[in-house]
A protein has these predicted regions:
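Alpha-helical metal-binding/catalytic segments enriched in His/Glu/Asp
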Residues: 94-98
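Aromatic- and glycine-enriched beta-alpha-beta binding-site module
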Residues: 99, 103
Length: 119
């Protein structure tokens, strides 16, 4: 017999419940240490490498290849548009976190979301 996993908004409901229960039993599970290494290239251009992090009481090694992100400035700020500027990258992170949290909370409450745009 095949078992199907119930998902809402792309999240498995059993995983949501398991995560909540794990945090309630051991609040240290919720502590995360995120890391980034940034290297200046030239002018306003720099590059960040993101790979490992500590979370859920363990070191995460699931990323075999690091994420590489470029930051730069627009020409008006003496850059070459080789990437979003650092303030834009920060905004991307904030709205991404807000959007994911909202959709996850909706899923945890059984609410299906069909579309979201955050600004």
């Amino acid at each position: 017999m095949e078992t199907t996993t119930k998902t809402i908004n792309g999240f498995e409901l059993l995983s949501i419940a398991g995560t909540v229960n794990a945090i309630q039993e051991n609040p240290a599970v919720a502590a995360f240490e995120l890391r980034v290494e940034n290297t200046w290239v030239t002018g306003g251009h720099n590059q960040s490498k993101i790979q490992g992090f500590y979370g859920a009481c363990q070191e995460d090694t699931s990323r075999e290849t690091p994420f590489i992100l470029d930051n730069d400035e627009p020409p008006v700020l003496m850059g070459n548009n080789l990437g979003a500027n650092p303030a834009e990258a920060l905004l991307h992170g904030m709205v991404g976190c807000m959007t994911t949290s909202m959709v996850l909370l909706a899923a945890a409450n059984g609410i299906e979301v069909t579309a979201v745009t955050s600004r």
